[in-house]
Design a protein with these regions (language model features):
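Sec-dependent bacterial lipoprotein signal peptides
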Residues: 1-19
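N-terminal capping/linker segments that flank leucine-rich repeat
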Residues: 2, 21-94, 249-277
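Conserved hydrophobic beta-strand positions in leucine-rich repeat
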Residues: 47, 71-75, 95-97, 114-118, ...
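Conserved hydrophobic position(s) of the canonical leucine-rich repeat
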Residues: 70, 92, 102, 113, ...
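Consensus "Asn ladder" position of solenoid repeat domains
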Residues: 78, 100, 121, 140-143, ...
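Canonical leucine-rich repeat
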Residues: 83-86, 105, 126-129, 148, ...
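Right-handed parallel beta-helix
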Residues: 86, 94-145, 152
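Ankyrin-repeat and related helical/solenoid repeat scaffolds used for protein-protein interactions
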Residues: 198-254
Length: 277
């Protein structure tokens, strides 16, 4: 009797071991899947169409592993109002989402981005740009920003024309080569720490004075239709094209003796002179 009891215990123990091992094997074969929430149906629809969302269904989620494979997103004019979920695209390098309906976006987790193009949205706020250490191209034109701070070590090209900008702070942009800021409401600009700047375009603003003495690499300056009372380009030896016409309170543009500027566009009431009093 004792022997039967003993064998019964052994058999039960063996069965429990087999069941436990079976569960472990099942877990190995069927790992827990992580999903990313994508609440915007138009965003997910495009992910499905581009073969990024592997389940092929618009169901407000994609696999995190799908998101992590993506290095480039092209989302031009897709009716997208939210890019919630983009934080899981941790290997994203290039984001093109022009002509949508975005109001805000947080790119704090997309630290590998080198190109961001969000032209023609409804943006008033963007977060996380200072974390994108590879960022060289930033286009935010045709949006609704009223203030903006550029704080990124590597940005070379910055486009922010056709906004409602009243305040623009260039806090940290040592590698900036080109800035386009046409048609805003900016009254002051300071690019004194952007020593590599070659192209500066800010026509149709409200700027009265600007100190460009540090920006000796400048080649192109377009600043028509501002409110300048003085304009000194005498310390900029590399200028190719300067357009400073339609500044009604600016009569004299200061240049250096012998300074040659191939294209200098002035209004008929303006002159370029070595002395402006």
């Amino acid at each position: 009797m004792k022997k039967l009891h003993y064998f019964a215990i052994i058999i039960i123990a063996m069965l429990l071991t087999i069941v436990a091992c079976s569960k472990i094997d099942d877990e190995d074969l069927n790992p827990v899947l992580e999903f990313v929430v994508i609440p915007d149906a138009n965003f997910e629809k495009e992910l499905v169409l581009q073969g990024i969302d592997s389940d092929g269904i618009v169901n407000q989620k994609i696999l995190k592993s799908d998101a992590e494979k993506v290095e480039k997103l092209s989302l031009y004019s897709k009716g997208i109002s939210s890019l919630t979920g983009i934080e899981s695209f941790s290997n994203l390098k290039r984001l093109y989402a022009d002509a949508n309906s975005l109001k805000t976006i947080d790119l704090s987790s997309n630290v590998l981005l080198d190109t961001i193009s969000l032209t023609s949205n409804n943006l008033t706020k963007i977060e996380g740009l200072e974390r994108a250490k590879n960022l060289t191209w930033l286009s935010l034109s045709w949006n609704y920003f009223t203030e903006f701070t550029l704080d990124n070590d590597n940005v070379k090209n910055f486009l922010m024309d056709h906004n409602d900008l009243v305040s623009l702070e260039i806090k940290n942009a040592p590698k900036l080569e080109s800035a386009t800021l046409n048609i805003n409401k900016i009254s002051s600009l300071d690019f004194s720490n952007s020593l590599l700047l070659k192209t500066l375009i800010f026509s149709a603003n409200r700027v009265k004075t600007i100190d460009l003495s540090n920006n000796v690499n400048l080649e192109y300056i377009y600043c028509s239709s501002n409110l300048f009372t003085e304009f000194d380009i005498s310390k900029l030896p590399n200028l190719i094209d300067v357009r400073v016409d339609r500044n009604p309170t600016l009569n004299c543009i200061k240049i250096a003796p012998g300074q040659q500027i191939p294209t200098l566009k002035l209004s008929d009431y303006q002159t370029a002179n070595i002395n402006c009093n």
